[in-house]
Regions:
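Glycine-rich phosphate/pyrophosphate-handling loop used in enzymes and phosphotransfer proteins
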Residues: 1-202
Length: 202
């Protein structure tokens, strides 16, 4: 599935939109996100999107390992140069987690953390308010829906670096809001690694 790997050399380092030469895109220059670096490994299109749906909506947890393997095959170049004090899967609200029975980002993160020897931030450290599923909303609705959705319930070490893991990166509004909340609570650099993102217009 290497043909679905996103070429970082031709992507904005902050939103992974296609940009010749890998420069920061105009949108991110105008309004930089709260996180410091972003990476998405694959394009969200068949068969990758079908594999993610099997994990996320059909509760096929066996799909988490091959998907994590694909992430590692196209991993961020900055993994070798940056230090992470904690790794955190994108939190789900209590209501959504109970309904689904698991957190798909957590399933991926557990595999990656063992592979790279990372320390997981405890699940109870971050609370997420329940709201409408982001995938059902338009861009401006996503920003309103996710505003003030997170609350840090644990004391973070001052200036700690955190790596966020998510399954699908679309507009980045959820990761941006979480990064903003973490930094307000004392975190240092925030890095984001997403399994996939939809293809963007060049």
């Amino acid at each position: 599935l290497t043909e679905y790997f996103i070429d970082a050399a031709q992507s904005c380092p902050l939103c992974f939109r296609h940009v010749a030469g890998g420069a920061v895109c105009g949108s991110c220059q105008k309004k930089p996100p709260a996180f410091d670096r972003m990476w998405a490994s694959l394009y969200y299109e068949p068969p990758v999107s079908s594999m993610i749906r099997e994990l996320k909506h059909l509760a096929d947890l066996g799909m988490s390992r091959p998907l994590a393997d694909l992430m590692c095959q196209n991993a961020p170049g900055w993994l070798a140069t940056e230090h992470f004090d904690f790794v955190l899967p994108m939190p789900l609200s209590k209501e959504r987690r109970l309904k689904r029975g698991f957190n798909q980002s957590e399933a991926l993160t557990d595999i990656l953390a063992k592979r790279y020897g990372w320390t997981l931030l405890p699940r109870h450290a971050v609370f997420r308010r329940h709201g409408e599923p982001q995938s059902t909303l338009k861009s401006d609705e996503r920003r309103r829906n996710i505003k003030n959705a997170f609350k840090i319930k644990a004391e973070l070490p001052k200036a700690c670096n955190i790596l966020l893991i998510d399954d699908v990166f679309t507009t980045g509004s959820t990761l941006d809001e979480l990064a903003k909340t973490l930094k307000k609570s004392g975190a240092g650099k925030i890095f984001c690694w997403s399994l996939a993102r939809p293809p963007m217009k060049k």
